[in-house]
Amino acid sequence: MLSKILSSATYGIDAYLVEVETHVEKQIPGFIIVGLPDSAVKESRERVTAAIKNSGFEYPLKKITVNLAPADIKKEGSSFDLPIAIGLLTATGLIESNKLVDTVFLGELSLDGKLRPVKGALPITVEAKKKGIKRIILPVASSVEASIVDEIDVYGVTKLDEVVDFLNGTNELVPIKSDRREIFLRVNKYHLDFSDVKGQENVKRALEVAAAGAHNIIMIGPPGSGKTMLAKRLPTILPPLTFDEALETTKIHSIAGILSRDTALITERPFRSPHHTVSDAALVGGGSFPRPGEVSFAHHGVLFLDELPEFKKNVLEVLRQPLEDSRVTVSRSKLSLEFPANFMLAAAMNPCPCGYFTDPNKECTCTPPLIQKYMAKISGPLLDRIDIHIEVPAVKYKELATEAPAEKSGIIRDRVIKARDIQLNRFKEYKHIFNNADMGSKEVRKYCKLDTSGEELLKMAMTKLGLSARAYDRILKVSRTIADIDNSENVLPQHVSEAIQYRSLDRELWKH
């Protein structure tokens, strides 16, 4: 007897439907799975056999053939256990085939018939809805993320016999639903705040400008000056995630299996801070069957690289593509997958190996060649993609001891949102430009025009401060963002003057 049942698998951050065909015939007992299964799928035979027996159902001593279609795409993971078991029970007559119409099954079985959570429940549910599927049955531990998708019934189950009873009408299950409005009411309730940081007003201002224009930023300063503390609070001043952004971010975390079981939707901007020993595959994604990396986990959020020169050079170089394209392409011999990676880069570094090159209170013990070698670890092409460089001085005792309240993240965020709204309106006719950092040379010439005073100021700065040619466009972009924060239609000399301050690493001081 033959049964056909629907399941699904992930491909990149999306999913595709898989038809599980089960054929049972009177021949020498055996269990074969075809359709390019990986080792985890092949092992389903043992899990399904034990789960059926331990759930109290009769296991057929016949030849069983399972085909996973389409057969030309490799299937991986243990999520096919439940559909294979249901298909087998249907083929042997324990479940009526008409009960399986417009239903997707998903879940890993333990040997006693209980269901374990699976990766990718959210993108699979989204794909099922697109294809007109009416319901999805999956482990209760994976049902919370799936329940955010509307217009499809999501049933969370705990064991195999519960699914069989539900399909046969002897057990009632209630679809799980999540309230999007309730979830988004909790948005922006961060436990960190910029008001926690004493002093460093210039650095806070630079971070506000970076957030307002989506500019990448690097902070240079001695140990203990607060670089990491400031970077961790950067997401608190970014605009709230839209529903589409939250959905895309959650899908990435879902397929990687790092989404919390009680999280229906990620509503806070991600903040990822990989250690400097991270490999290039872990940073941008990789593996024999490609998986997303840290740059994708930081999608619509912040990627923070602390101690930037300590990262391996090849690791830093692979950052160039995602910084330029906001996407990562991972190619293998038989497939090529694309993962979104639209993040803000925030980096921090000491000015030299000992850390005290720019500290007026402590003597630097590094020789000039040592400092030059240390700085050379960051390539020009990577630095070229970072718009704002800001020096972070050591905090003075007077600032640490002050009782005066500092500005809260919410107030800064309101200014950032207003500046972003101006940019969205400015670039509404462009498909791939949403903020000032996205501008190319053509857009910079159009939207960042300077008056005579501004031109003279920039020319003098380029000459006297020894700024590089690549700093020119960066200064104009940042000037435009500062003007947007001030709600100024024109880029004024004071905006240019402030932007010039944010090119620390282009100065002659760092080149010798």
Predicted regions and their residues:
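Walker A/P-loop
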Residues: 219-260, 325
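Peripheral, non-AAA+ core regions of ATP-driven protein-machinery
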Residues: 1-218, 222-225, 266, 331, ...
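Residues immediately C-terminal
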Residues: 111, 303-304, 310-311
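Basic, amphipathic alpha-helical bundle interface domains used for macromolecular binding and assembly
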Residues: 34, 40-45, 58-60, 67-77, ...
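Walker B catalytic acidic pair
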Residues: 300, 306-307, 318
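P-loop NTPase nucleotide-binding/switch module
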Residues: 171-209, 213, 240-295
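The Walker A (P-loop) glycine that initiates the GxxxxGKT/S ATP-binding motif of P-loop NTPases
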Residues: 221, 285, 307
